[in-house]
Amino acid sequence: MNDLRYPIGQFTYKRPITEEMIDTWIQEIEDLPNELTKAIKDLDQKQLDTPYRVGGWTVRQVVHHVVDSHMNSYIRFKLALTEKNPTIKPYKEEKWAELPDSKLPVDVSLVMLDSLHKRWVNLLYSLELEDLEKTFNHPDTGETKLAAAIGLYAWHGRHHTAHITSLRKRLNW
């Protein structure tokens, strides 16, 4: 049986990272607001409040989490572009998913995601090759180059979209 936590597998990539890979990943980041919107289209409130797996987040929480995560990533990129290997602040995503705003309508986060991604993608397309080598330091996972972080967040969006689409398929929604 497939691991419901990782419907598209865990994040991996071939090295070296090529310009073609970067372009593909940026396009996936650009497409995410539309893909996530399509994934939840026509779901009712009960469906939005259904966990994608036993012990997992609800569809609603997944949508809000994507925005929380990508807001953090956008800030990490800006820090890495303006400081030398900044140490970024991790956040407790599982606790964020329990905060009151995670119960808001998903449209609130979809609007935020669309606006955020417009700014983020504009920034990503402006990066020079030397910018892609810039890094940030995560206290738990260490140093990350921006090139790899682009791939990680492209995967992250597809990963959570697949949580929703695979749930819909399993439950025939």
Swiss-Prot record:
Homodimer. Keywords: Cytoplasm, Hydrolase, Metal-binding, Zinc. Its EC number is 3.-.-.-. Its cofactor is Zn(2+). InterPro entries: DinB-like, DinB/YfiT-like, Put_metal_dep_hydrolase_YfiT. One of its GO terms (molecular function) is hydrolase activity. Belongs to the metal hydrolase YfiT family. Zn(2+) binds at residues 65, 156, 160. Binds 1 zinc ion per subunit. Its main location: cytoplasm. GO terms for cellular component: cytoplasm. This is Putative metal-dependent hydrolase BCE33L2441. Possible metal-dependent hydrolase. It is found in: Cytoplasm. It comes from the Bacteria.
